[in-house]
Amino acid sequence: MPSSNKVRKVTSENYPTDAGREGELIFRLVYQQTGCKKLFSRLWLSSMEDSAIREGFANLKPSTEYDALYQAALCRERADWMVGINCSRLFSCLYGQPLAVGRVMTPVLAMTVVREAAIAAFVPQKFYTVELELTSGCTASSRRISEKDAAENLLAECRKEMISTIQKVARKEKSENPPLLYDLTTLQRDANRLLGYSAQQTLNYVQSLYEKKLTTYPRTDSCYITDDDEEMLAGLTDELEEFLGIAADTADFAVPRTRRTVNRDKVTDHHAILPTRSMLQADLDALPTGERNVLKLIIARTLMAVSKPYRYLETMLTTECAGEEFTAKGKEILEEGWKAVERKVLADILSRKQEFTTLPAMEESECAILSAELKEGHTSPPKHFTEDICCERGIRNHP
């Protein structure tokens, strides 16, 4: 056959399977089954954009660079087979009914059962606090008191004195650096926390965005880019700001701080998830709601990651009344930084504004008490495992 003659004349092969562990395994298994001995090179793509595909063909990699990736996938396959086939058969025989055992599934199930047992056995404990409303304009709280009689006695003493002594006012400037770029796990956590999407839903959405050339490769465990990508990211953030119409709206969208996103040592198979330049020409309103929301998260995180830190002044007030110490904490924003990006880009996703107390300027002195109240509370049980917690613990994306 002519086609067979053409095959025999081929001296080397290129394989473009999914650029990840399982894609590597699929090609190697097929290659081994064919008995082919020809040399082969790897086409490794992090984006489906035409420019990225052309660059990939221009920079084909020797297959030997991905031998460790293939071996890792092969170990995963063999481990799943050994544990799943053998243990499922063993426990099905022991219990007289079909019982599936999995290398990942069974430990996760055990972890969940232990947590649910702890929740079921939890007995809530009451506690009490005394709250003082001061004329300075803030509310100070006592420590937690387990005995109601002791709390009521403290309340009575405070109401009798109606004067507190401010012992200490500590002010400290603090800052929060921007979050890193998204890897798959952090994207899934945010999508679950903010949008209620399951980890699988988020993966489906971002995979579809990748296939539509709107985002880069989704199955990455890196939150960084390489030095080669830094110039690309700087240009992309400028275009994103212009695309969203926010660049001139606030000083927090200043020169992008891309250097903090660069760490070649922490980029394994793929860099962090980014929007592509093709996205800038796309009709985002035509996307399904889930895909549009996930894309908005990725755009916001890309801009947040290169923005200024969030700076604020934290004030801790310590006051004394009836021999008991009361405390109040407040916060004053100095520079909104990356939180301004989050607020503006995700305005329709963030369910509520961040609330905090601003304490007035105070000095160490006596302060009158306007009112004193007794508050009752209960200790909380451990939290049920959620998609967010499962992603945080790495049990969804690192099988």
Describe the residue ranges of each PLM region.
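Toprim catalytic domain recognition across nucleic-acid enzymes
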Residues: 1-399
